[in-house]
Swiss-Prot record:
Protein name, UniProt field: 1-deoxy-D-xylulose 5-phosphate reductoisomerase
Catalytic activity: 2-C-methyl-D-erythritol 4-phosphate + NADP(+) = 1-deoxy-D-xylulose 5-phosphate + NADPH + H(+)
Binding site for NADPH: 28-31, 54-56, 142, 144, 223
This protein's UniProt keywords: Isoprene biosynthesis, Manganese, Metal-binding, NADP, Oxidoreductase
Cofactor(s) it depends on: Mg(2+); Mn(2+)
Lineage: Bacteria, Bacillati, Cyanobacteriota, Cyanophyceae, Acaryochloridales
Species per Swiss-Prot/TrEMBL record: Thermosynechococcus vestitus (strain NIES-2133 / IAM M-273 / BP-1)
């Protein structure tokens, strides 16, 4: 048989099975457990060197027994005796560390080639920097690292010659679509959003939202913080800032569209108006696996996308009145400097207060707007890491102060 007219260099041979060593930050969370599912399914491709977790020992201890890491970190040093006792029968015991220094130690530890950052929030920034300085590639599932720390992280990637690969669905989709696109060929990034728990609610009903309502995501299984962010569409606003840093795209050329089915994970428009998209069932393991295996494609036995079963794919413009957080994120991104760090910290704190039932749902964007307005006059254009961490602390304290005084819910910008 003659060779094909178009040589796309498809190999029917399985890729060489090189075991890749991983350090996993946030092992007991949603990203962490799904990453370990991948490791368990492909033990001939991946091995765990280090685990960093929070306070969930009930979930962490079985992970240690199954994956046998060399080092383990937990958030609370007071839990170390309990963890040591639970592992007393292990013939090979991991090194146990704790606190913020412990997370950074795991991030930089040993012969791990890749660090998966699954820690929620700005807490992932310092350990990610530690991993970069140790020369380890980053599978980024913690968007706040770039949102808050972009001005610091990007130069460090260049300085230490490490790769940062997106491990969340939207930015992985963009990254996959960009494979083979020549420099200068990208015109626009289109981020798709499910619309969250309240996509079909009228604006007037949002004043009645409960925490339980906000945590009912229609498509994805995620942690509570990111599920609330999806309900406010702040998640997508933060992803706009992340896309700006990841792909160097101007904010005017990053668009958000509501796509309720969550089958198209994002799209790119090229200079000739061609549009490329990445499709798949809503499954976080897919972008995680690609970030871990890139540039390879590892065969899986997961359910492939069936377009007939998927049915109609629909799109609509987001409602700026319903989703004011989206506009706040664009404004913070355009302001640059430390302002995205302030936006992110204010959002984290406001969402935590909402989940604790200390504020109403509509107070989340109002608090964020007030904090960003206060900070605008003191924004630092080229912040250091210390500047970013100081801005983060200031924003959290200011949210607490404003919440204690009481705020009026904002419906529209």
């Amino acid at each position: 048989m003659s060779p094909p007219a178009v040589d796309i260099k498809v190999s029917t041979d399985a890729p060489p099975k090189i075991v890749k060593a991983l350090n996993l930050l946030g092992s007991t969370g949603s990203i962490g457990t799904q990453t370990l599912d991948i490791v368990a399914q492909y033990p001939d491709r991946f091995r765990v060197v280090g685990l960093a977790a929070g306070r969930n020992l009930e979930r962490l201890i079985p992970q240690i027994r199954q994956f046998q890491p060399e080092i383990v970190s937990i958030a609370d040093p007071e839990q170390l005796p309990e963890l040591e006792a639970a592992l007393a029968d292990l013939p090979q015991k991991p090194q146990l560390v704790a606190g913020e220094a412990g997370i950074a130690a795991v991030a930089a530890y040993g012969d791990a080639e890749v660090v998966v950052t699954g820690i929620v929030g700005c807490a992932g920034l310092v350990p990610t920097i530690a991993a970069i300085k140790a020369g380890k590639d980053i599978a980024l599932a913690n968007k706040e690292t770039l949102i808050a720390g972009g001005p610091v992280v990007l130069p460090l990637l260049q300085e230490y010659g490490v790769k940062l690969l997106p491990a969340d669905s939207e930015h992985s989709a963009i990254f996959q679509c960009l494979q083979g696109v020549p420099e200068g060929g990208l015109r626009k990034i289109i981020l798709t959003a499910s619309g969250g728990a309240f996509r079909d609610w009228p604006v007037e009903k949002l004043a009645q939202v409960t925490v339980a309502d906000a945590l009912k995501h229609p498509n994805w299984s995620m942690g509570p913080k990111i599920t609330v962010d999806s309900a406010t569409l702040m998640n997508k606003g933060l992803e706009v800032i992340e896309a700006h840093y990841l792909f160097g795209m101007d904010y005017d050329n990053i668009e958000i569209v509501i796509h309720p089915q969550s089958i198209i994970h994002s799209l790119i428009e090229l200079q000739d108006t061609s549009v490329l998209a990445q499709l798949g069932w809503p499954d976080m393991r897919l972008p995680l696996l690609y970030a871990l295996s890139w540039p390879e494609r590892i065969p899986t036995n997961w359910s492939p996308l069936d377009l007939v079963k998927a049915g109609d794919l629909t799109f609509r413009s987001p409602d700026h009145q319903k989703y004011p957080c989206m506009g706040l994120a664009y404004a913070a991104g355009r302001a640059g400097g430390a302002m995205p760090a302030v936006l992110n910290a204010a959002n984290e704190q406001a969402v935590a207060l909402f989940i604790a039932e200390a504020i109403a749902f509509l107070e989340i964007p109002r608090l964020i707007e007030m904090v960003c307005d206060r900070y605008s006059a003191q924004n630092i254009p080229n912040p250091t890491l210390e500047d970013i961490l100081a801005a983060d602390r200031w924003a959290r304290a200011t949210v607490q102060e404003l919440a204690q005084r009481g705020v009026s819910p904002m419906v529209a910008l």
